[in-house]
């Protein structure tokens, strides 16, 4: 039995959880999310708490106990508070702008990188180099932030590129000059 999986999920006011045989639906003030369940994982709503349990304590299902508890907890937190990721752009001439439903990135290439912003996400750009991605689906926020970062990941010699706010990038020493 998982230590995380045993913990109950408390439901704040305004959050509604519906459980069917194959999926869990969470509806809150910021939006609604659904998660499919595999056979053998049971979800019960008891008053103000959600409990995740296994049909039997098989080793095959034990992996999913903590996973589904965390996924449902992230759905509850997302529909009430939301999630946010911040990215920093470091480099001469690197800048970003939001144009309608596109994120326009100038990253030193001969062409601008235009990324479509997924539905359900809000993207804000401050000072042309700070990108804030927010939404109620943790997976979608993290995936889009990773997609933006992958356009120009930080390089190890000068540290130029797109990085998560607060991310530490190890720098390498440059090539030593040859002695004559």
Swiss-Prot record:
UniProt keyword RNA-binding present: yes
Highest taxon of the lineage: Bacteria
InterPro entries xref list: Ribosomal_uL6-like, Ribosomal_uL6-like_a/b-dom_sf, Ribosomal_uL6_a/b-dom, Ribosomal_uL6_bac-type
Assigned GO CC terms: cytosolic large ribosomal subunit
Transmembrane regions listed in the UniProt entry: none
GO molecular function, one term: rRNA binding
Keywords in alphabetical order: Ribonucleoprotein, Ribosomal protein, RNA-binding, rRNA-binding
Gene3D superfamilies: Ribosomal protein L6, alpha-beta domain
Entries under HAMAP family matching the protein: Ribosomal_uL6_B
Complex formation: Part of the 50S ribosomal subunit.
Family to which this protein belongs: Belongs to the universal ribosomal protein uL6 family.
NCBIfam families reported for this sequence: L6_bact
Function noted in UniProt: This protein binds to the 23S rRNA, and is important in its secondary structure. It is located near the subunit interface in the base of the L7/L12 stalk, and near the tRNA binding site of the peptidyltransferase center.
Name the record gives this protein: Large ribosomal subunit protein uL6
Organism: Protochlamydia amoebophila (strain UWE25)
Lineage: Bacteria, Pseudomonadati, Chlamydiota, Chlamydiia, Parachlamydiales
Gene name of the record: rplF
